[in-house]
């Protein structure tokens, strides 16, 4: 999914003003519920210190996903930060100095690519953490002058509720061995990418 950032937005307040009443109310409710969250970007040293917690929170979300084609290695986030440096950002959500959630971003020229995230299920329900993360990603994109936010193909309805639009993607795979292998490969890809019914939301005036 792709979220185009409007040129007239210079702050999250501009974004909020363009929302319809229903979705502006939803935004304010989420912000109010997440008010107690201490949010901050994690440095390389903090990522190293919190490595196990980051993986645990990521795994918590990953294990509850409907379909999961792979599992990241335990040092994945630390390794990516070491390689991409300032082009890879992790933002932690803390409650009473305990990490209860995080999201990560890849800065790719004019596009902000959302990456993996994680959260504690109890805190997610209490604080609407996932929705707050989506709004915080939007804030980061606006304040840092990105043109688009690129989202994964999961939780499409809630992402469309903040302004993201579905974007058709194509994949071409060919096995070099045989026709049978290609037929099996096609079935595997179809299984790993099930069609989900969802309702697109239109949050803007």
Predicted regions and their residues:
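Extended, hydrophobic alpha-helical segments in both membrane/secreted and soluble proteins
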Residues: 54, 114, 133-137, 155
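Conserved acetyl-CoA-binding loop-helix of GNAT-fold acetyltransferases
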Residues: 124-139, 151
